[in-house]
Amino acid sequence: MGQGWTVGFAKKPPSVHAWVMPWAIFLLLGVTVFRCIRPWVGGPENFAPLAALALCGSLYFPRPWNWVGPILALFVSDVFLNLHYGLGPITGSTWMAGIAYLLIISIGNGFAQRRSWPIWLMGSLGATFLFYLVTNTGAWWTLPGYEKSFAGWSQALTTGLPGYPPTWTFLRASLVSDLLFTVLFVGGVEWSVRRFPGKARPILSAATNR
């Protein structure tokens, strides 16, 4: 007889938000800094934890931080990066990303009552494709380099504009980062509340395997 994790999530106790909030603030700051320093530390484009944060925030963050936190992290880091690249503080891509993250937050809110690892990992994949579709459709609609036709839209979703990496490579990086950070965020909180059981009960349930 051994101990293992079930795929189900246990009922969330009221005390978990009070305990997680300092950790959530640290996480929001970490995500913002991570995104700001990426041009200097390198790594693939679109390898960022924001989509995972938007998805998982509804599970752990109290309202209104479940949506204010990810959107604030987006705008703060976008202002920094846009100014670094010589652009305006807020660009069209910032607004499109904001719309995508709000939709992802809505997915997370819907999944908050369906607490299981398979559901949330599938939600992570769905969030990746949703962000990719919304932001690249916005680029197709606003950038003059794309023909305003189905062929131009297909180009925006696959090869992108000449002189830039194909857009499908951004999708690949997003898939990896969203899955990775979803597991890290959820796993980190669950490990913490089990490591310090006097603070709050874990949301993921522990079970006995026979």
Language-model features: locations:
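Interfacial aromatic-anchored transmembrane helix boundaries in multi-pass membrane proteins
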Residues: R35-F47, L72-G110
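Hydrophobic transmembrane alpha-helices
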Residues: G2-F61, W65-V68
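Membrane-embedded alpha-helical hairpins and interfacial helices in multi-pass inner-membrane proteins
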Residues: S116-R201
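Alpha-helical transmembrane segments of multi-pass membrane proteins
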Residues: V31, S58-L59, L74, D78, ...
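Hydrophobic alpha-helical transmembrane segments
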Residues: A24-F26, W67-I71, T94-I99, L121-L125, ...
